[in-house]
């Protein structure tokens, strides 16, 4: 084994195995995307005058209780439009049974009693740990009601989309910030807009503790024919410093209000987009980016991947190609160490349900937010039988249950496999594995010096196998589990497995 040029300081932090950072050499192994362990429809009461407007939703863990923000529209409307969408709120203690928040601030669709918190708003609420402007709750999204005058003052003088009188281009658009002390009563941030562009999907903003800046993930526009929707990224040092930092392009059409049409790559770099490995007409958007707070250097995104039917002819087998801007969507998984460079793994994370089921089979969008309860992570997504561009059937919200750290694993089959890490420097006296060996699998860990020489007492021959299934299994050798004598010096791990899935490792103090 050649001398290493880099030693990874892992301390006592948990390290996830979703890329090759900790796999310097290997044989007989593969990385695997693991879909949710369980998918359960939620029980969400409905109001007679409203129906789902789109698939966009967000779940927040607020003081141990779950808050679900989702979007509805008046039932009599034929097709969803962001200007007739309403952001609504529900609460739950168990994540399955929900109650509508008794907001009762606006009369909508003839309903005086309802859970609408923001009429004409489409976007993503988030919790700001910095409590900018003294507010814990913030929201990023589009604003603009159809009703005149708007029933909500905060939607006045906003632009979701309009048409320029000179050339007919749709250029009046912006993305806005709002804030709230209680998550129910919202006020618009008046110091500016996030971006003066039309990003009419579920956009995101959150504080990145690693960089000390606020990060926005926005819908971008690709110049590549057939690949229109992308994910763009911008930053700002503060929520009050608007717009987010982007280079101006004076050649872009501009409305009298100083607003533009789509967000192009010269103004905001793409971090996710369709490419040559996708079908020619494929969009990637609504990224649902989640910094993973239970491990080091891990960000998971769950973009919707949309394959367009345009230009197809199914010869009357079905309706493919008969309508513009139509086609199916699935949720894929993208992984990142820094929130900038993403590796989109092409296996569906939440795929389409059976077409024969009345509520499934057309489109799936993941909601924003990860919630941990014990050894499991919970997410929420919306699925419907309708494909994009067809809105004759409603969407339904589901809960997805995932194992802690379980999104990606390094897997060995029954013939076995192994990998060796680069040199790492740890703290603590115990080594823990999040691993599933089932009933027939096992794993062994050998610790080596920086050059790859097995360390006495920690060789493969000394190793006691780890078996069965656990999120924090202690590694032992014949002399016991104590790795404290090696703390603070460069070592390598050689992990040998068969019939096993390894998700993460972590050094810790003795238990």
Task: Name each region found by the language model.
Residues 1-203, 207-286, 291-361, 374-376, ...:
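Beta-rich carbohydrate-recognition and catalytic domains
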């Amino acid at each position: 084994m050649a001398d290493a040029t880099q030693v990874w300081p892992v301390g006592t932090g948990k390290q996830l195995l979703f890329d090759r950072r900790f796999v310097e050499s290997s044989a007989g192994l593969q990385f695997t995307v693991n879909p949710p362990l369980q998918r359960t429809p939620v029980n969400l009461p409905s109001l007679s005058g409203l129906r789902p407007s789109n698939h966009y939703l967000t779940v927040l863990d607020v003081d141990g209780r779950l808050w679900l923000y989702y979007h509805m529209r008046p039932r009599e409307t034929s097709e969803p439009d962001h200007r007739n969408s309403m952001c609504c709120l529900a609460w739950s203690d168990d994540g399955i049974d929900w109650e509508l928040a008794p907001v009762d601030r606006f009369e909508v669709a003839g309903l005086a009693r309802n859970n609408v918190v923001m009429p004409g708003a489409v976007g993503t609420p988030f919790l700001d740990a910095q409590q900018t402007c003294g507010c814990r709750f913030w929201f990023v999204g589009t604003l603009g009601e159809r009703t005149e005058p708007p029933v909500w003052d905060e939607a006045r003088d906003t632009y979701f989309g309009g048409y320029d009188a000179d050339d007919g281009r749709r250029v009046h658009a912006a993305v806005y910030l709002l804030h709230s002390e209680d998550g129910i009563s919202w006020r618009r941030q008046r110091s500016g807009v996030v971006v003066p562009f039309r990003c009419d999907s579920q956009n995101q903003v959150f504080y990145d503790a690693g960089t000390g800046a606020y990060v926005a993930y926005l819908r971008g526009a690709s110049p590549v024919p057939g690949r229109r929707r992308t994910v763009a990224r911008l930053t700002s040092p503060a929520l009050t410093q608007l717009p987010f930092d982007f280079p101006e392009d004076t050649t872009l059409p501009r409305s009298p209000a100083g607003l533009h049409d789509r967000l192009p790559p010269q103004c905001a770099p793409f971090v996710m987009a369709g490419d040559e490995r996708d079908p020619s007409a494929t969009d990637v958007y609504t990224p649902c980016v989640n910094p993973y707070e239970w491990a080091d250097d891990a960000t998971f995104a769950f973009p919707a991947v949309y394959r367009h039917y345009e230009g197809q002819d199914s010869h009357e087998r079905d309706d493919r190609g008969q309508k513009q801007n139509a086609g199916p969507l699935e949720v894929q998984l993208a992984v990142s160490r820094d929130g900038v460079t993403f590796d989109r793994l092409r296996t569906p994370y939440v795929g389409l349900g059976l077409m024969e089921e009345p509520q499934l089979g057309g489109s799936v969008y993941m909601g924003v937010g990860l919630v941990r309860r014990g050894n499991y992570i919970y997410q929420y997504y919306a699925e419907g039988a309708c494909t994009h561009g067809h809105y004759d059937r409603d969407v339904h919200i589901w809960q997805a249950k995932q194992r802690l750290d379980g999104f990606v694993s390094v897997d060995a089959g029954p013939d076995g496999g192994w990998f060796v890490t680069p040199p790492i420097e740890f703290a603590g006296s115990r080594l823990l594995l999040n691993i599933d060996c089932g009933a027939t699998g096992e794993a062994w860990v050998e610790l080596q010096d920086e050059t790859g020489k097995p360390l006495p007492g920690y060789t493969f021959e000394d190793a006691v196998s780890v078996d069965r299934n656990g999120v924090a299994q202690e590694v032992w050798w014949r002399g016991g589990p104590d790795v404290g004598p090696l703390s603070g010096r460069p070592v390598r791990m050689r992990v040998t497995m068969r019939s096993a899935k390894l998700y993460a490792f972590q050094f810790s103090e003795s238990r």
